[in-house]
């Protein structure tokens, strides 16, 4: 049986503002982006690993750690407001023009250096077993329920997300409300048809892939020490410390 073509795409523009040049930041002895490249290359189900970048230095470092740089990302897809859809559409059209269309595209964000390859493989396997699915999103259980959240309209509060059948969900015990999950960026997978034909990163049929525990990412400078410590624990095979327990009323 022919192995499925699975493309790992790591988007890494040069103009990050919250942490300048963060994709090249040294974290526990390696550039941040090197970890995601390593995750993709160590995954037995990934057949090709590329980095989409507009930056020469990121391109050079990515090549050094084993990624392909088949193109330079155009400027319009490398702004602060550029969307994932723009980035992935550009890559897929580039490859389509050259006769290559993968079955799946695995989205690995370079800001998350702590991943377990077996979970990436499990997510890919799940998508391969569900050809009807347009995409897969990794998720985690939300600590706060949106059914107890509010927005301010004028001088007064309005419930942010009313729940059908629960007229006063804001005053109900949290345990009686439906579980809600947030997307955590650990690993996302999408079919090319979803992007090119549906103009979407998720489509209509989205598989859930629950990843438990803390997700370590770099978004702000103050996160750097904790992120480096998490990477060092991960390299030693040590678990994260147990989180503090919070007591919820009602």
What are the roles of these predicted feature ranges?
Residues 57-106, 115, 121-125:
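Short phosphate-binding loop-to-helix
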Residues 32-48, 64:
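A short, N-terminal amphipathic alpha-helix
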Residues 25-26, 51, 107:
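Conserved SAM-binding loop
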Residues 1-20:
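N-terminal nucleotide-binding beta1-loop-alpha1 segment
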Residues 86, 113-204, 210-212:
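Conserved core of the sugar-phosphate nucleotidyltransferase
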Residues 5-10, 33, 48-51:
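Hydrophobic targeting segments
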Residues 2, 178-250:
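Conserved alpha/beta core of the MobA/IspD/sugar-nucleotide pyrophosphorylase nucleotidyltransferase superfamily
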Residues 45-50, 134, 214-215:
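Short active-site oxyanion
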């Amino acid at each position: 049986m022919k192995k499925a073509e699975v493309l790992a795409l790591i988007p890494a523009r040069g103009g990050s503002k919250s942490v300048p040049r963060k994709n090249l930041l040294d974290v526990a002895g390696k550039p941040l982006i090197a970890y995601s490249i390593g995750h993709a290359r160590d995954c037995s189900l990934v057949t090709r690993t590329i980095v989409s970048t507009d930056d020469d230095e990121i391109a050079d470092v990515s090549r050094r750690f084993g990624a392909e740089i088949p193109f330079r990302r155009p400027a319009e897809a490398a702004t602060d407001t550029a969307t994932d859809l723009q980035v992935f559409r550009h890559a897929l059209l580039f490859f389509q023009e050259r006769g290559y269309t993968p079955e799946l595209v695995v989205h690995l964000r370079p800001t998350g250096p702590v991943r377990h390859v077996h979970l990436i493989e499990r997510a890919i396997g799940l998508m391969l077993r569900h050809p009807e699915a347009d995409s897969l999103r990794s998720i985690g259980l939300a600590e706060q329920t949106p059914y107890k959240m509010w927005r301010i309209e004028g001088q007064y509060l309005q419930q942010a997300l009313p729940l059908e059948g629960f007229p006063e969900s804001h005053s109900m015990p949290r345990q009686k409300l439906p579980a809600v999950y947030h997307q955590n960026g650990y690993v996302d997978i999408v079919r090319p048809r979803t992007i090119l034909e549906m103009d979407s990163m998720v489509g209509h049929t989205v598989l859930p892939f629950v990843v438990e525990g803390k997700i370590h990412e770099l978004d702000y400078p103050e996160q750097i020490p904790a992120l480096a410590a998490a990477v060092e624990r991960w390299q030693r095979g040590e678990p994260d410390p147990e989180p503090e327990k919070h007591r919820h009323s009602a």
